[in-house]
């Protein structure tokens, strides 16, 4: 929805917390959204041509936002320098969607996301992540 997009866009403007914290918040919101509907509905949306443009537009919005926060995290020295925001965002979002389509629990998907982001983090980033547990 447009309200959701506006709220998510405000994450970019927030100065509280690190970019990595905002990355987690965004990823967790994406995950929460996937669990608002049945996985079979998501599968239908993904494969029906009538919904393809909307699905692609939605995916591109999330990819762009997540890539922005990943790059900002890298600039803050919280992610490894070899991480390329756009392609890493693509992989994370694709994998999260696949996990949801394969009926992984929300907790499993959150844990996966946390593990992947922690694995891409610098020592300073890992310390921030672990401090938030």
Q: Where do the model's predicted regions map?
A:
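Hydrophobic alpha-helical segments that form the core
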Residues: 29-31, 80-119
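Charged, low-complexity C-terminal accessory regions
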Residues: 29, 125-133
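Short linear capping/connector segments at secondary-structure termini
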Residues: 42-50, 130-133
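Hydrophobic alpha-helical connector segments
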Residues: 6-36, 88-89
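Amphipathic alpha-helical packing segments from all-alpha helical-bundle domains
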Residues: 33, 51-76, 86-94, 101
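Short, basic, alpha-helical segments at the C-terminal edge of helix-turn-helix-like DNA-binding modules
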Residues: 1-5
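Short amphipathic alpha-helical interaction patches enriched in hydrophobic/aromatic residues
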Residues: 8, 12, 49, 77, ...
């Amino acid at each position: 929805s447009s309200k959701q997009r506006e709220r998510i866009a405000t994450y970019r403007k927030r100065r509280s917390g690190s970019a990595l914290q905002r990355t987690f918040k965004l990823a967790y919101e994406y995950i929460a959204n996937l669990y608002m509907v049945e996985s079979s509905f998501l599968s239908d949306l993904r494969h029906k041509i009538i919904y393809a443009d909307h699905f692609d537009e939605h995916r591109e919005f999330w990819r762009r936002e997540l890539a922005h926060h990943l790059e900002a995290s890298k600039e803050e020295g919280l992610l490894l320098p070899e991480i390329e925001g756009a392609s890493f965002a693509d992989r994370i979002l694709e994998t999260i969607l696949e996990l949801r389509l394969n009926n992984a629990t929300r907790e499993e998907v959150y844990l996966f996301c946390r593990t992947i982001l922690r694995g891409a983090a610098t020592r300073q980033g890992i310390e921030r992540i672990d401090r938030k547990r």
